Amino acid sequence: MSKDEILEIIKASRAKGTSSPFVGALDREAEIDKTLVQLESCLVQPFTVEVVAAYHPQEGCEFINKPNVVVIAEANKEYLLYSISTKLFAKAWRTGENQFTLLGFSTDDVIAEWRG
């Protein structure tokens, strides 16, 4: 998977809208666009990773121990993951050389997941 493919996936997610709150923003659309610019500046060359559960309820998550999960962005030691098979995004911490633990939920809303 290339960065160009990731950009297309991000644009498709953006086109669906976002549920992410922008409390206090006078121009919500401008804030969303600013968030996307910031995300694009943090894109990395996608690489496949292993995702492990941080706690028992995550063990059934669509990211845990599944193939085709890639890192697509990184900022402040937090990583944005994308599941090629489920087409969902999730934020994670790096817990090993090629091992990541989810911070929370996964959705198809790239903006909500990137903002955490």
Give each language-model segment a name.
Residues I6-I10, I32, I64, I72, ...:
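Weak global preference for isoleucine
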Residues C42-T101:
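Amphipathic protein-protein interaction modules
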Residues W93-G116:
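Compact, glycine/acidic-enriched structural inserts
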Residues M1-G60:
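N-terminal domain-onset segments
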